[in-house]
Amino acid sequence: MVKVGKLVEEQKAAMEEEKEVNAEAAEELEEAEEASCNGSKKKVVPGIVYLGHVPPRFRPLHVRNLLSVYGEVGRVFFQAEDPFVRRKKKAAAAAGGKKGAKYSKDYTEGWVEFRDKRIAKRVAASLHNTPMGARKRSPFRYDLWNLKYLHRFTWSHLSEHLAFERQVRRQRLRAEVAQAKRETDFYLRNVEQGQRFLAADGDATRPNSSWTFTQRPTEQELRAQKGARPGGRERARLATVQDQARSNRGLLARIFGASLLAESRKEP
């Protein structure tokens, strides 16, 4: 499995290199065609280099000073880090005893425009994976350049991409605000409804909303009701006497019936 993974990675790397070579060849053909059409006048086309790693406290002025040695540098743009990540870093610095004023905003990536794309290609190919600082006392001496030339990429493409990201961020923020507003309204409605219920429980003018159920009277309740009527006590006493007589009669029948049966068995 490890060998298969290595083979797949090698194939991907080879395909990427082939794409870059084809793109460079296509650009060289375009340059040759432009040169043949214009004769001795060559049109200078700007090129953009992507900076994938930006060290802490590395600013656009630093990259302009470092790269302007190799050619004329035009526009430079650095993408600031996410505000949430910055707040976490500030909190960690404050928890570690560091002053928050010393922490400055950092960047995650950048784009550098050269006036001539041939110089941009040469700079990206020669400075990639080399130390950023040439002097020993430079704070970026142990950081390496991570440069890549962007084929057929113009500054307008970058502007469109950044505008799209801003629009997406605004839409996400609007959706989060709307969701928070819906949750707040739902909570307030529940609170108001609970307050109305509490006020209704303490209001004596409102009818009681409790449920009542009627059940059939039991035998004991019926006897008690009959006993409470006039003449009912006598009937109840007679009923109890009759019940006792029935029980006594049955008991005597069982006793004497068993004795008579035993005597009949003894007689031959």
From Swiss-Prot:
Domain RRM: residue ranges: 47-144
Keyword Signal: no
InterPro entries xref list: ABT1/Esf2, ABT1/ESF2_RRM, Nucleotide-bd_a/b_plait_sf, RBD_domain_sf
CDD domains reported in the protein's UniProt record: RRM_ABT1_like (cd12263)
Family matches, as SUPFAM superfamilies: RNA-binding domain, RBD (SSF54928)
Predominant place of localization: nucleus
Keywords linked to the UniProt accession: Coiled coil, DNA-binding, Nucleus, RNA-binding, Transcription, Transcription regulation
GO term, biological process aspect, one: regulation of transcription by RNA polymerase II
Compartmental location: Nucleus; Nucleus, Nucleolus
Region of interest (Disordered), residue spans: 200-242
Molecular function terms, GO-annotated: DNA binding; RNA binding
A cellular component term, taken from the record's GO annotations: transcription regulator complex
Ranges annotated as biased composition (Polar residues): 206-217
Family listed: Belongs to the ESF2/ABP1 family.
Subunit-structure text: Interacts with IGHMBP2. Interacts with ESF1/ABTAP.
Stated name of the protein: Activator of basal transcription 1
Source species: Rattus norvegicus (Rat)
Gene name in the database record: Abt1
